[in-house]
């Protein structure tokens, strides 16, 4: 027959084994949770680095696009100015020829004996 004290000691040892088993299980779960936390943190860090790199690449592409747009716009402005200047010159020449022809028609002169009309001379009828 087992004494009461031995039973009590056996129950205490059993409780200690259960507590020890729970501690071991808890430590394992905490280690697993910590490893998962570290893995998630590493993934987030990698994603943050990738996002930063993509943002830097986008910024470079944006600067390149803006630079190209500015250059194209400047070229278009230069072309427009050249076209405007050429059109103005053509209009001056057409007006000069019109004045000369009108003077010749009014005075009945031919081109060879008509008075020379300077480019900036206003027409006087």
UniProtKB/Swiss-Prot annotation:
Protein name: 17 kDa gas vesicle protein
Location(s) in or outside the cell: Gas vesicle
Keyword list, A-Z: Gas vesicle
Organism annotation: Dactylococcopsis salina (strain PCC 8305) (Myxobactron salinum)
Lineage: Bacteria, Bacillati, Cyanobacteriota, Cyanophyceae, Synechococcales
Domain of life: Bacteria
Role this protein plays: Gas vesicles (GV) are hollow, gas filled proteinaceous nanostructures. During planktonic growth they allow positioning of the organism at a favorable depth for light or nutrient acquisition.
Cellular component, GO annotation: gas vesicle
Membership in a protein family: Belongs to the gas vesicle GvpC family.
UniProt key word Transport: no
Chief location: other
């Amino acid at each position: 027959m087992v004494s009461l004290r031995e039973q009590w000691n056996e129950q205490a040892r059993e409780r200690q084994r259960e507590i020890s088993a729970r501690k071991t299980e808890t430590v394992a779960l905490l280690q697993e949770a910590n490893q998962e936390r570290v893995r998630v943190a590493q993934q987030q860090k990698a994603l943050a680095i990738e996002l930063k790199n993509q943002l830097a690449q986008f910024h470079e592409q944006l600067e390149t696009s803006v630079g190209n747009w500015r250059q194209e716009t400047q070229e278009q402005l230069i072309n427009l100015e050249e076209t405007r200047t050429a059109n103005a010159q053509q209009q001056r020449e057409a007006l000069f020829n019109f004045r000369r022809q009108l003077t010749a028609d009014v005075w009945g002169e031919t081109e060879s004996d008509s008075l020379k009309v300077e480019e900036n001379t206003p027409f006087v009828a």
